[in-house]
Structure formats: C-alpha cells, structure tokens
Amino acid sequence: MAVSEVLKNVIILNGDFEDIIKYVDKNTFIYMDPPYRPLNASSNFNEYSKEPFNDDAQRRLSKFCNELNEIGAKIMKSNSDPKNTDENDEFFDELYSNYNISRISASRSINSKGTGRGKVSEILITNY
C-alpha cells in the first residue's frame, strides 16, 4: 500500500501533548518525540516553547502516557539515555517502570567538536 493511502487516515496535531486525549481510543498509535532530556550542561537546549521541557514536564508526560495506556492506545516514546553520562541515572527507568524500555544505538553527526560526534544510546519506551 502506498504511503499516501495510509496517510489519508492519519491526523497530525501540533500543540500541547495533553490536547490529543479527545482523539485517542484503543485503535490509536502514538509516537512521541519530546525535547530530549539534557545529558550534560552543553546539551541543555530544551526550550521549543515559552516553557522549557524540563524534568517536571517529563513527569507530566509520563502521567499522560499512563492515561493513554489505560485507554488502550499503543505508545512509543523516544528520548536521550541518561546512562550515556551517568550509569546510575534511573530517571526514565523509574518513570516508565511499567513499560518496555529498549536502548538503541543512534548516530550523532551534529556537534561543535568532531570528537563529540558518533554513536550514543537512546531509549525507546513502549507499552506493547
């Protein structure tokens, strides 16, 4: 099937993530790619709107994922893996302890220092 055919039944929304709840049912698949949690002081850009997407916003998103999960929607969420810089950082492991967390290798080609480019671990969180 052509992508254009599949996309005829897709709704793409732009806004606060909580605004989508009225469109969600058990047949909904949601992929979330929020601003990534900074891994260090030099990678701390997370202000895509007037409010920074900080740890409190990450917690709010986690609670929202729980609501979506209760409805029966399929959820996939990506983010940075804090274990890249601190093996003991359990932030996402604790927030999403009832979900499946996979660590995947991702390439980074943008960095002011050539030595900072290369492979890093990212997380994929799913409820299926």
Regions found by a protein language model. Give the residues of each.
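Conserved phosphate-coordination/catalytic loops
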Residues: 11-15, 52-59, 116-119
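Short, glycine/charged-enriched secondary-structure capping and boundary segments
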Residues: 27-28, 44-47, 90-92, 117-118
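Class I S-adenosyl-L-methionine
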Residues: 95-128
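Conserved Class I SAM-dependent methyltransferase catalytic core
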Residues: 58-107
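SAM-dependent methyltransferase catalytic-core segment centered on the flexible catalytic loop
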Residues: 37-72
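SAM-dependent nucleic-acid methyltransferase catalytic core
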Residues: 1-46, 60
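Short catalytic/ligand-binding loop motif for oxyanion handling, primarily in non-cytosolic enzymes
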Residues: 21, 38-41, 83-87, 111-112
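Anionic group-transfer/hydrolysis microenvironments
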Residues: 35, 80, 128
